Amino acid sequence: MTEDPSASTGRQFHELSRVPVDPDAGVVYEFGWQSWSPSTAYPVSAGGGFRPTRPELQTSYYRREKPAPAAAFQGEGLLAIEPAPGEPVHVVALRDGRAEVPTIRAERRSDTLHVAADGAVDQVVDDGPGGLYGALARFADRYIAAVGTPTLRDVPPMWASWYQYFTGFTEDDLIRNLDAMDALDLPVGIVRLDDAFQAGIGDWLAPSEGFSSLDGMIGRVLDRGRRAGIWTAPLLVGAESRTFAEHPDWLVRDAAGRPIVAQHNWNQDCYVLDATHPAAADYLREVFTTYRRYGATYFMVDFMYAGAIEGVRHADVDGITAYRDALRLIRSCIGDDALLQACGAPMFPSVGLVDTMRVGTDVAPHWFPPGGEMSSPATRAAVVSTVGRAFTQGRFWINDPDCLVARPQIEGRERWAEVVDRYGGVRISSDGLDQLDDWGLETTHRLLVPARTAPFDPSRVPLDTSLFQDTPPTVEHSAGAPR
């Protein structure tokens, strides 16, 4: 058993440089730890970026071990400074996120930013075209040249159950939407069966009351000539699950021996599965080989940040190693020909191991995040990080901006559709298809195309700051009633 690294005070920061800036016009870009961590550029005058609005969110949405100071900028593995418009961009970045992801900070003192890191990083002054986002794209090119260029697979357009039905999704809902796909001639290549089919968080091979059987559920999709995809949160174990009751030894623990809570969700505490435990690893193998045997060829693994939380594991490994080993285990079960999508996942440690990656928060029927928490589900929050991480598209993986939601009840649906179109890679519809009006159906038809694989070019698709505006969009009611 390894000692709990999270109990330590962490590595010391060392100063790298001092960058003169225009306090009124300079900007600093922060790259967040995982999918839902805010990633965008801020005015130097802000003094720092978005931070957790409640302490427990440090674990579930940010980086548990590395809380950011209120009066400094902080990037996980990547931070960039544009001292003034048109000036060369200072890109401070890690060397290899497969082993460690240093934290980088920039503290403003008058008209200078003091830059420091707690690990090995390089600082490049980029005077190329495209400003800040051009410099970030060139960093991403250098990074994959050093660690290996991922293979980008073809990803067809999809439909997912989540944003219409959430945990209330049933087999009847599935059948109704499969019928609608045929009737509306929607080019859905993969149907993703999202959170709702399973008996519990951690009980992945037992169906919920809404489904007769898991193999039958997947079979219904295959019988329509479409591919089946399935959602799991494989590194979470819910306190109410049978897995938790029967296998408490499968959990990652703190130095005092208490199981680490990764998140409170589904009305229960959710703990971290220790995938280095031989029996827990065997369980993961059983889950994913079973789904593959049933016919699933697309796998969305969610809440994956849990697997990289530092703690006491069966094997003497750090969190990043444990996380990457868990992804490799899953890949070995589903095969190289299957599609693997990560969400809520550590960014740099995932490069080269996943096909598609969520790059922002969840969208939602509402525009503004509750309580101003920019890592929580809200469409404005999703816009900010989807645009802020657009440079990773076609370089680290294929970007998932999150699903297109186009029914009339969605605040800002037209603005969100524009973001998906301009900055996204993967295309996924997630409305009840009988809830779409004329605008929603036309938009869904137009945007449901195969995923882009080309690298995002910030010179061709410049940042549109109007997408961030703080005036709440109206709920549009286009001509035509829901079908």
Label every PLM stretch briefly.
Residues L214, G319-L327:
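Amphipathic alpha-helical segments in well-structured domains
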Residues V155-W159, Q164-T289, Y298-V301, A306-A315:
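Aromatic-lined carbohydrate-binding/catalytic grooves of carbohydrate-active enzymes
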Residues L174, A180, L184-D185, P207, ...:
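Carbohydrate-binding surfaces of carbohydrate-active enzymes
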Residues G311-I320, L353-T356:
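Short glycine/threonine-rich loop-to-helix capping motif typified by GTGT followed
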Residues L132-P150:
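N-terminal carbohydrate-binding accessory modules
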Residues M1-A137:
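N-terminal accessory beta-strand-rich subdomains and adjacent acidic, glycine-rich linkers
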Residues F244-P278, D282, D325-L436:
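Glycan-recognition surfaces
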Residues G295-T297, V359:
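Glycine-enriched alpha-helix->loop->beta-strand junction motifs that scaffold or abut catalytic
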